[in-house]
Amino acid sequence: MNTTLITGASSGIGAAFARKLAARGRNVLLVARSEDKLIALCNELGRLTSIRAQYVALDLEQPDAAAQLFDETKKRELEIDMLINNAGFGSMGDFAKLDPNRELEMIQLNIRAVVDLTHRFLPAMRAQKRGTIINVASTAGFQAVPYMATYAATKAFVLSFSEALWDENRLHGVHVMALCPGVTETGFFDASKIERPPMRTVQTPEEVVDTALRGLARKKSVVVSGWTNWLMTEAERFVPRSLVTRVAGKALRPRFE
């Protein structure tokens, strides 16, 4: 059964992907930690569409989680022809004062889980000469971000990794794309306990997913969501990297000193 696997699917961008793709007739396998939210979303999709919505409650911060998830798809006889690596989180603050264990957990989820899941599901897609992988990066991946040092670095990895795989796989029928949202109305700021930016700069998860699906139809390797975000990422190419870093640091420093 052809199925889209979405990680971080219980809310935000992941849930928006689930709703948009279900409306297009795609079966979905939703993965997140919160079983209650996954059940509610599967029930919602079942009421509103004719697709089959399934879930796996799993913490991808655990090193063996990707293997467990892959084995579960085989047990259910699901053919994953679209993988959306959306699960991730960020931290903010002076790196020297942050919990080192939490920073390493972020690397596990934002990087290792993405690489592990991609490597497990990609071979079957190539064998079938069709498939799609969307890795959710961030506009933070285009430059260093003081006081978000680890988070920005993980998203830079996802961006570079995805661009490389786009070229490696484009002649094998598999399309790999990096989605780079800017500030999005999810639970990120509540969890990080920081001030939200002005609402005019914030997109909804639905807006981000609509942009992603348009970019996917055009076979783009990188999609930046939002005109302002795209303009900023392009402008940074013409400014010294050290200046971009200092400007970002100046904007965030007062919150943490």
Roles of regions detected by a PLM:
Residues 118, 154:
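Active-site helix of classical SDR
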Residues 86-91:
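Conserved NAD(P)H cofactor-binding loop of Rossmann-fold oxidoreductase domains
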Residues 94-96, 102-107:
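Substrate-binding pocket helix/loop in short-chain dehydrogenase/reductase
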Residues 24-41:
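Conserved glycine-rich Rossmann-like NAD(P)H-binding loop of the short-chain dehydrogenase/reductase
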Residues 10-11:
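Conserved glycine-rich cofactor-binding loop
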Residues 138:
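Residue(s) in the substrate-gating loop at a strand-loop-helix junction
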Residues 166-231, 242:
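SDR active-site lid
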